[in-house]
């Protein structure tokens, strides 16, 4: 009987000691994880723009602790990527430069307003109510939701159209996500420091486009026929440029009769 009691007591003591040791180790590991997270957070910009594909900087830091690559922060650029890689002890391949551009040039100089909207000055509200203040149903509404949302003040509205300050743009994509008409796009830099982009989203036939906007794409295919790298196709009356293969030569810009193609310079 005594043997059984002592055996049970010994097992209980071993279990207690083991539990205490596990608690101590887990707390030390937790402290270590907290320290890593804090340090990674100190390197990141802390603007929570979501360009990395995560809701915020903390979530990205946690993802890196679980193996995510350190080069997803376009806001921080190569400097932040290298610092993160050095701390994590991994190799950084550098950050792919990304720029936003507005696929619309329909300012008040090129398009006629159809009505005056007297309400909340918001693109989202205006779009939800299905109003069309412009003769072009694809154009920028110009109420500046994108400018208000940009954490870097890289978007301004000039003469009724949003414009991106490429020097201030970090490629976070906040403006593109909030635009109700989807006319703001993100372009990743390929081999060339410049790329040609179509600054129009109008898919109406060329004759109809000419009636509503003087700088809209009319689908004439001149750009596609002259592109030396065959980077341009015309689908549904709208030219589309593959920026991965575009070398930024500008040939398409020169031949476009409505000046609906512009050069995008990566900063």
PLM feature segments, named:
Residues 250:
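Basic, amphipathic alpha-helical segments enriched in Lys/Arg and hydrophobic/aromatic residues
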Residues 2-226, 230, 255, 259-262, ...:
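Ferredoxin-type iron-sulfur electron-transfer modules and their immediate structural context
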Residues 229-238:
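Cys/His-clustered metal-coordination modules, chiefly Zn-binding fingers
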Residues 162, 238-239:
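Hydrophobic residues embedded in beta-strands of well-ordered beta-sheets
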């Amino acid at each position: 009987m005594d043997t059984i009691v002592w055996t049970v007591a010994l097992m209980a003591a071993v279990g207690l000691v083991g539990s205490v040791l596990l608690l101590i180790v887990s707390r030390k590991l937790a402290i270590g994880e907290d320290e890593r997270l804090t340090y990674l957070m100190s390197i990141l910009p802390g603007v929570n723009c979501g360009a990395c594909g995560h809701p915020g900087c903390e979530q990205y830091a946690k993802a890196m602790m679980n193996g995510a690559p350190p080069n997803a922060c376009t806001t921080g650029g190569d400097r932040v990527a290298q610092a993160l890689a050095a701390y994590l002890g991994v190799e950084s391949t550098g950050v792919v430069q990304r720029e936003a551009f507005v696929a619309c040039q329909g300012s008040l100089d090129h398009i006629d307003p159809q009505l005056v909207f007297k309400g909340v000055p918001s693109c989202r509200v205006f779009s939800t109510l299905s109003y069309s203040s412009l003769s072009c149903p694809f154009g920028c509404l110009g109420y500046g939701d994108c400018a208000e949302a940009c954490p870097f003040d890289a978007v301004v509205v000039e003469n009724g159209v949003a414009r991106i300050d490429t020097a201030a743009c970090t490629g976070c994509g906040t403006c593109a996500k909030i635009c109700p008409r989807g006319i703001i796009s993100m372009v990743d830099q390929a081999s060339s420091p410049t790329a040609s982009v179509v600054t129009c989203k109008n898919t109406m036939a060329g004759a109809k486009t000419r009636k509503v906007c003087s700088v809209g794409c009319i689908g004439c295919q001149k750009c596609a026929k002259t592109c030396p790298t065959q980077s341009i196709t015309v689908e549904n009356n709208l030219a589309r440029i593959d920026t991965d293969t575009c070398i930024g030569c500008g040939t398409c810009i020169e031949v476009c009769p409505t000046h609906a193609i512009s050069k995008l310079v990566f900063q």
